[in-house]
């Protein structure tokens, strides 16, 4: 054969080898992607999320304890995220959340009765503890508001009560995994009238976001994972379509909203605990 033909044959062989090498590398990359990828799920409200349960040790959770306010309790929802997660993991659940609960140990209402998430934290037990909320410190005393504070042990402040709640949970449940969830954005409605907005300031000059930001920063100091439900794109209470689908009163997620919350909590668990 001619020299040109030999060169062509050599080039073809070289290209074939390169193609096989590339295919082999592609197969390796795809295998790695399969190992780290999660199952894509479309929730009942059309939200596309990822389900990490099969890849996470969350499957080993046998008992779940939840504390928080009316959102965690499941107000205006047929079922809540704790019940959904318990069913998915086949785990027993305890939900101590109460409507109107503040983080701080401050008196509420005319009878000055305390209704705090900190007290719930003293009682809760479980392999997985979920701490949700809250907007009620922002709204306390008809918007008088609870100070955010800067002491980790001052139970009369939002920050101090939250830090103390996490610490008492750790003391009572030394092997437990902890997940935190902030308040969502809100636009409570009375028909077509907006009752309030999360951007409104209380008498301390604080918005709901101020409390959320303090809580998120505290989670870094406490080394616990947090689902920042305020800054997520999944909850849009100012959008009438979203409200009609997943948050009818502009404040409390219905069961469709709780389904999204469940998957976001699972994701945060997987990212932090594996």
Task: Annotate each PLM feature.
Residues 85-86, 169, 218-219:
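A generic structural signal for well-ordered alpha-helical segments
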Residues 183-274:
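Catalytic His-Asp segment of secreted/periplasmic serine-dependent ester chemistry enzymes
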Residues 1-67, 71-77, 87-88, 123-124, ...:
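N-terminal secretory targeting modules
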Residues 162-166, 212:
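Generic structural signal for well-ordered alpha-helices
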Residues 132, 179-181:
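Conserved, well-ordered alpha-helix/loop/beta-strand core segments that scaffold catalytic motifs
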Residues 61-66, 71-160:
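Conserved SGNH/GDSL esterase-like catalytic core that processes O-acyl groups on lipids
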Residues 173-177:
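A short helix->loop->beta-strand "cap" motif at the edges of active sites that frequently abuts
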